[in-house]
């Protein structure tokens, strides 16, 4: 069965998302932002398919556009004046570029977090942090599961409320508002009760007690070790490039970045390889499957 990047050891998944999320939030060079955004979108497409990726981008792109528009509307710093707004404030190239960069950073972080919630399931989080920080791992795993479960339960509750109404849509804005408020109140109560029941259940099973053992299906295989070496190698090289100033960029007072040299180009290439790791691994696995199928 093909499982792609999600089938790797939880340590591989956790290290990858720690690296790409840190890079998306720290590296503000336009090329790094573009690599991170494209890598996140390609990984999302590889993991979840075209339909879910299109739905995710439907929410992400407007948020990016909003961030790109808001910054030049309120920030007027910068030396290159393009024009003047009706308020009399200047519209500068630097504020516009900073807004675009902020939008790209926001979009890439949102896409990477969507990939992270898909790959880092609750059992993986409990496996990684259950021994060292059992309470934190339980809370974190419940938090990652909360949004999709809350959405499903809200949709189910709305359907039940409509069924009690004879299956008819509520008439008028006021009736629809009452239905929405009632459904939201029911789901909030359900989520609180579910959290308490989960905590009581885990406590009854001895979760978090000293010396407690737990069964795990995860084993560090040879391919996991190679993936860890791959991630640590590219991640360490990108970190060295960032500390050396090879990925530096300045938005104010003028746009300025590190000169492009073979050395700085290698830093960008390393970051590209890092961000597209899930796509590369999925492509390699698909190639092996096709080769195995051709021999049958």
Tell where the protein language model's regions lie, with residue ranges.
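Transmembrane alpha-helix interface motif
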Residues: 2-45, 156-296
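Membrane-interface helix-boundary motifs at transmembrane edges
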Residues: 46-55
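Helix-boundary and loop/linker segments of multi-pass membrane transporters
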Residues: 6-10, 53, 87, 130-131, ...
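N-terminal leader/targeting helix
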Residues: 55-56, 183
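Membrane-helix interface segments
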Residues: 30, 50, 133-136
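Juxtamembrane/interface alpha-helical elements of multi-pass membrane proteins
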Residues: 56-174, 290-296
């Amino acid at each position: 069965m093909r499982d792609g990047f999600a089938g790797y050891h939880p340590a591989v998944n956790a290290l990858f998302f720690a690296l790409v999320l840190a890079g998306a939030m720290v590296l503000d060079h336009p090329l790094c932002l573009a690599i991170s955004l494209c890598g996140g979108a390609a990984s999302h497409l590889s993991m979840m398919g075209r339909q879910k990726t299109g739905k995710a981008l439907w929410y992400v792109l407007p948020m990016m556009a909003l961030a790109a528009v808001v910054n030049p509307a309120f920030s007027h710093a910068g030396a290159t004046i393009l024009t003047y707004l009706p308020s009399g404030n200047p519209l500068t190239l630097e504020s516009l570029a900073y807004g675009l960069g902020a939008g790209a950073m926001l979009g890439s972080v949102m896409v990477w977090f969507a990939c992270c919630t898909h790959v880092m399931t609750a059992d993986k989080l409990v496996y990684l942090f259950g021994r060292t920080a059992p309470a934190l791992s339980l809370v974190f795993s419940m938090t990652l599961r909360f949004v999709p479960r809350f959405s499903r339960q809200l949709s189910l509750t709305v359907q039940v409320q409509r069924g009690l109404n004879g299956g008819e849509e509520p008439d008028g804005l006021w009736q629809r508002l009452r239905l929405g408020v009632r459904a939201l109140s029911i789901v909030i109560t359900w989520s609180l009760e579910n959290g308490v029941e989960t905590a009581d259940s885990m406590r009854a099973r001895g979760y978090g007690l000293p010396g407690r053992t737990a069964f795990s299906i995860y084993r560090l295989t040879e391919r996991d070790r190679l993936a860890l070496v791959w991630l640590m190698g590219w991640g360490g090289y990108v970190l060295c490039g960032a500390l050396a100033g090879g990925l530096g960029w300045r938005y104010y007072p003028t746009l300025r970045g590190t000169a492009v040299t073979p050395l700085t180009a290698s830093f960008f290439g390393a970051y590209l390889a890092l961000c597209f790791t899930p796509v590369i691994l999925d492509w390699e696995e698909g190639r092996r499957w096709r080769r195995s199928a051709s021999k049958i």
